[in-house]
Amino acid sequence: MIRTVITGITGRMGSTLLRLALDSGDLRVVGGTARPGSASVGQDAGVATRLGPVDVTVVDSLERALDAAQADVVIDFTSAELSVAHAKVCAARGVALVVGSTGFTPEASAALAESAKAVPIVAAPNMSVGVNLVIRMAAELARVLGPGFDVEVLEAHHRMKKDAPSGTALRLAEVLTEALGRTQEDLTFARHGQIGARPAREIGVQTLRGGDVVGEHTVYFLGEGERIELTHRATNRDQFAAGALRAARWVAGRAPGLHDMADVLGFQRTS
């Protein structure tokens, strides 16, 4: 059994991770955290999430969770700032880490990479297997279609999402620029007013926010007389949690290093 701690265990992603882990047969949840001052601190995690008792008491810090139980891996879907702090704790304790948070600054990404020198870390803006297949296919389409097609990325999420564009949209933009031999300067994140004709090298990344949209990403390849649309729509959070649990199985017991879902899924690197 892989002994697992879930940060933010009573939140939307945390409770989904707990539910799927309980049904997994090979993952044992031994700890969980909630923010300091949360009403769930001190409660049984299963009771707090209406799953029934699971004999895991919610605590208010990762340090306390790791003090209370030996763990093989921590799964973290909190925030970029907290994930960096949690990575430092895992590095000090020798515990593997799976990070699904988004909104990382370059400095935060560098701090995460520093912690990965001590422990294995899987970090990805989207843990869904389907999304990661879309990312891979988008890069391949861009390489095959080449400069004859204009490329745009559109993402939509619920009104409560704090960062924009989404981490997945930024990852799509990253692989598209690599595949097309372009740079960050070719990305545009907003258009307004008399902007003139579209530059040939431009890649647009646009954002929608509203309602309860779990997550939707579309890459448009716009050519003369034809258009290709590559879309992933999430209707619940189960696929994100399932991907994170898959990553937890993969990373537990590995040597230190920073990995992403392409490594977990065994994708051959193309760039």
Curated annotation (Swiss-Prot):
EC class: oxidoreductase
UniProt-annotated binding residues for NAD(+): 8-13, 100-102, 124-127
Residues annotated for (S)-2,3,4,5-tetrahydrodipicolinate binding in this entry: 158, 167-168
Protein keywords: Amino-acid biosynthesis, Cytoplasm, Diaminopimelate biosynthesis, Lysine biosynthesis, NAD, NADP, Oxidoreductase
Function (record text): Catalyzes the conversion of 4-hydroxy-tetrahydrodipicolinate (HTPA) to tetrahydrodipicolinate.
One Gene Ontology molecular-function label: NADP binding
Protein name according to UniProt: 4-hydroxy-tetrahydrodipicolinate reductase
Species for this entry: Myxococcus xanthus (strain DK1622)
Pathway: Amino-acid biosynthesis; L-lysine biosynthesis via DAP pathway; (S)-tetrahydrodipicolinate from L-aspartate: step 4/4
Similarity annotation: Belongs to the DapB family.
Catalytic residues (UniProt): 157, 161
Recorded catalytic activity of this chain's protein: (S)-2,3,4,5-tetrahydrodipicolinate + NAD(+) + H2O = (2S,4S)-4-hydroxy-2,3,4,5-tetrahydrodipicolinate + NADH + H(+); (S)-2,3,4,5-tetrahydrodipicolinate + NADP(+) + H2O = (2S,4S)-4-hydroxy-2,3,4,5-tetrahydrodipicolinate + NADPH + H(+)
Residues annotated as binding NADP(+): 35
UniProt cross-references to Gene3D superfamilies, sorted A to Z: Dihydrodipicolinate Reductase, domain 2, NAD(P)-binding Rossmann-like Domain
NCBIfam families: dapB
GO CC terms in record: cytosol
E.C. numbers: 1.17.1.8
Localization in the cell: Cytoplasm
Regions crossing the membrane: none
Pfam families referenced in this protein's UniProt entry, alphabetically: DapB_C, DapB_N
GO biological process: diaminopimelate biosynthetic process; lysine biosynthetic process via diaminopimelate
